[in-house]
Every structure is written in C-alpha cells, then in structure tokens.
Regions:
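A generic structural signal for short hydrophobic patches within well-formed alpha-helices
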Residues: 9-10, 40-43, 76, 118-119
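Acidic catalytic patch
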Residues: 67-87
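Acidic, metal-associated active-site segment
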Residues: 94-110
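Histidine- and aromatic-rich ligand-binding microenvironments
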Residues: 5, 35-36, 93-94, 115
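Short, well-structured N-terminal submotif of metal-dependent ribonuclease cores
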Residues: 1-35, 47-61
Length: 131
C-alpha cells in the first residue's frame, strides 16, 4: 500500500504528464495510490490562496482517482507517538507532516514523497519518486 504526500500531489498537478511523478505512475499503474486527507487539505489550501488556480471542487475532481486515507482516532494516537519519537531523537518536523506520518504509519503504508525529513520517522517506509 502506497500513500502520497503533499509534494507528490503538487508535482502531479504541475508536471503536465511529464516528469518524476509521471514516471512513478507509469511504473506503478496497477497499484492503487492513497492520499491522506490532511495532504489533500494542504493542496486545497494552496488553491484558495493562489491567484487564478481554480476551485477546490475542480482540484478535488482532478485528484478523485486517489483513494482517501482519513485522519482517525487511531491515526491521531499514532501521530502523538511519531511526535514523541522525533522529539526524543532531536529531529522534529512540522506539525502537519507529523500528522501525515501518523496516518500513513498507522495503516502500514509506504509514504511516496521527495521530503527527506520523513526518513527521520521510525518505522515509516519512505519511497522517493524524485531526487
């Protein structure tokens, strides 16, 4: 099971079918991909604050091929564990990424990202799609 983070979504929306995301999708075309709803929120917020970027509904339709991973009670608890571990290791990451890591780790998915800081999260399998 693979879940994408915000960097993947932004790159998908801006690549125009060519680039690292397109290559990744071509290599994994038979696998379903999941998007944490928190990552979707981050992308939707970008639309609201960008000039001429369309609407949240338009963006949601462009991303409807992704399965959703909701933020649940179990993922909330997992995110607290992630934050505690990162703090103990002296490697904090931003709050929203802690929550995304909690969602993904709780369901046992791999996180598809180009953000290196997710590698600091114990027991979170990170798959890089771009360097």
């Amino acid at each position: 099971m693979k879940a994408v983070d915000t960097t993947f979504l932004v790159d998908y929306l801006t690549e125009d079918g060519e680039g690292p995301v397109a290559e990744f999708l071509g290599a994994t075309e038979n696998e379903p991909l999941y998007a944490p709803t928190l990552a979707l929120n981050e992308v939707y917020r970008g639309v609201i604050f960008a000039d001429g970027a369309g609407t949240v509904d338009d963006l949601s339709r462009r991303l409807e091929w992704l399965e959703r991973l909701p933020f649940t009670e179990a993922s909330a608890r997992e995110a607290v564990a992630v934050e505690r571990e990162l703090k103990a290791d002296g490697e904090p990451i931003n709050r929203l990424d802690v929550l995304i890591a909690g969602v993904v780790r709780e369901v046992g998915a791999e996180l598809v990202t180009r953000d290196e800081h997710f590698r600091a999260v114990d027991s979170l399998e990170v798959v890089e799609y771009a360097e």
